[in-house]
Amino acid sequence: MLLTINLSRIIMLNQLIKVSLLISFCGFMTACAGNKMKEIPLVKQVDLPKFMGDWYVIAVIPTAIETQSYNAIEHYELNLGGTIATTFTFNKGAFDGPLKTYQPTGFVRPESGNALWGMQFIWPIKAEYRIAYLDVQYQRTIIARNARDYVWIMARTPQISDENYLEMTSFVKNLGYDMTKLRKVPQDWSKKTSINDKPVN
């Protein structure tokens, strides 16, 4: 049993290392491209306490670990030191698939209006995390990257209206993303009694 647990941890660590290195490489290549790709604008100011809590992933251009995600949720909690304790959970492959949990730490970049974070899965790599869109009510957000490699469309509810979805996907398209890579994340909480039933490892 202990051997099985250790093997699972090793496999997960290897996945995180691969994803972190890939994200860093994409960021490096973007920097080398100079002015070929414009910097994605940040929202002017983010009220961090108001931004904390659960965000359902509505659609994504995914990293390697989330290509088969179902019921994906990103949860943020503000630490006393100002970092962001992040818990990303989803079922892999199906609504009843194995639960996956990742717990990176967000580091808010100074003088960014709290809209630019470095998301650290493994030390010392911090992946770029840009809050490019946030509605006034803090109900919908878009997390983007200058490399245009990954993007996350998220909301406080598992589903959003067709009108809001079209608005947000159009926003992503206008940022310069390849929309053929966008995956709508299946969300079905009909068998859950409350948000507290979200997957937790």
Regions found by a protein language model. Name each.
Residues 7-20:
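Bacterial N-terminal signal peptides that target proteins for export
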Residues 21-26:
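Hydrophobic helical h-region of N-terminal Sec-dependent signal peptides
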Residues 32-201:
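A beta-rich soluble binding module of mature secreted/lumenal proteins
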